[in-house]
Amino acid sequence: MSKVIGIDLGTTNSCIAIMDGSQPRVVENAEGARTTPSIVAFTDDERLVGQPAKRQAVTNPDNTIFGVKRLIGRRNDDAALAKDKKNLPFAVIDGGNGDAWVEAKGEKYSPSQISAFILGKMKETAESYLGEDVTQAVITVPAYFNDAQRQATKDAGKIAGLEVLRIINEPTAAALAYGLDKEQTQTIAVYDLGGGTFDVTILEIDDGLFEVKSTNGDTFLGGEDFDMRIVNYLADTFKKEHSVDLTQDKMALQRLKEAAEKAKIELSSSSQTEINQPFISMGSNGQPLHMVMKLTRSKLESLVGDLIKASLKPCKDALKDAGLSASDIDEIVLVGGMTRMPKVVEEVTKFFGKEPHKGVNPDEVVAMGAAIQAGVLQGDVKDVVLLDVTPLSLGIETLGGVFTRLIDRNTTIPTKKSQIFSTAEDNQNAVTIRVFQGEREMAADNKILGAFNLENIPPAPRGMPQIEVTFDIDANGIVSVGAMDKGTGKEQKITIQASGGLSDEDIEKMVKDAEENADADKARRELIEAKNQAESLIHSTEKSLEEHSDKVDPTTVEAIELAIAALKDEMESENADKIKSGIQNVTEAAMKLGEAIYNASQEENDDVAEPADGPHDDQDDIVDAEFEDLDNDKRA
């Protein structure tokens, strides 16, 4: 049975881990890094994922997609997306079903598809390390992801060729990695401020039992927002000095974004940094303009202070829902790259009244927790029980547009809940069940997950029919809803899919596209490897020919030269099979040269004759050497 892998699919970076014996192990990617940038780029002839995509972002901003996790499972008209759209160098469009999609090189891609390309890279990383195919995974999501976002993440796994055995919340995964070997009872808070999302989760750990008490968060608060504050500050300052708006230039905007991220990281360990971007724009008279600017840690803290404060309200709400106070928390575990910022650590310390735990790597701990959960599902990890919760209340719209809750937030999952409803009018023969998720009192103010009809209800006075509505949430946090007319036994069930979302046909098409692209990628890699091998062979053969052509007859030299010329022509054909055939021809032709060189070398060795008398044992000329044995204390 192949390994089940654990993947932290992050907004900024992604990470993969496996169980190595009894401990999780992070696997390095092809570039030798332990995390992979969650970036996908499209060029004229290939698709790039990870570090190669990040390297070319400045010169190809329109077709370099990043931060797609903030789009996944969202509608294109989502108010939260509006501020992001104007800051993104690539196009965010309506996917035709109301969902937010992206456009690159004239093609439309769903966020699930882009995420699948990243997951595909993680899958390749695992397969390269393990030396076997990988088909199953545990994937993490922010705890505050709603049903549509969870379903879209699961779709991404399917498109990437992975069976997603479990969707697990990021803070819960971090808690698993933190508490795997802890035997004492502890109440911990996981503060997870990542690249695009924020979560806080309160858990109780007791000798292998991980029970989530409450969770809260903001799926639009993270490092991307911090970066944009710096970008806007730099752009505003530059505009005041030079009357040039850099935000209107996509390449300049991408350079600013990279500079902002670099400055933010540097200011976590130093009090000041310099942002130096030569030739970032042109002045009105055509002269080049350069950006050289100092940014201090205190200035950065003033720019993002409200964002850090915004993370504390979910902390208060999570404690309240758990029925605890800050003093009841035994340990605070920091997760996500943004928790390296000193001001974040300071505010968290002040809020909880104690120093956070520093024994986990905030970039890797979530993937390690996912690997542990994978180990639990595979049977490799024993005596670990995870009890997670649903982050948001679930219910239906009832008379007057009221949101009637069936399952409250922070209910332990998996769970199932039923409630009896009735008709609103006399002789009503059908009811529409509209399913919502959220905390507002009116249904319209919450997130609609889907709707379905229960039909052919026998005529009866209003309030008479008994319609049982049942909500079922699985361990992934994905919702199924059913409705049954108790009088007739008629039943209707659906697994909630985002209104919009990806249909089964969409997913199958994307799976097929991914497989075709995988074949194309493999063919391209074979072509590159064949070309590299051909170039190396041509170089070594020509060098040998130059040095040893006098050792073979002219016919052999001509045959080798013709084979090399043919191989050079085949390298222009972009056909790996032809190049491999040419390599074989050059190798065979060059064998005669190799034999001639070997034979010539043997003849030279044979010409070295022994002295005429032969060997002798005469020791008359041997002189005994004199030596002095030094004491140990005099030796060097």
UniProtKB/Swiss-Prot annotation:
The keyword Nucleotide-binding applies. PROSITE patterns: HSP70_1, HSP70_2, HSP70_3. Keywords: ATP-binding, Chaperone, Nucleotide-binding, Phosphoprotein, Stress response. It comes from the Bacteria. Residues 533-552, 595-636 are annotated as: Disordered. Residues 540-552 have a biased composition (Basic and acidic residues). Residues 618-636 have a biased composition (Acidic residues). The keyword Chaperone applies. Coiled coil: none annotated. GO terms for molecular function: ATP binding; ATP-dependent protein folding chaperone; unfolded protein binding. The modification Phosphothreonine is found at residue 197. Induction: By stress conditions e.g. heat shock. Pfam families: HSP70. NCBIfam families: PRK00290.1, PRK05183.1, prok_dnaK. Belongs to the heat shock protein 70 family. Acts as a chaperone. PANTHER family: HEAT SHOCK PROTEIN 70KDA. This is Chaperone protein DnaK.
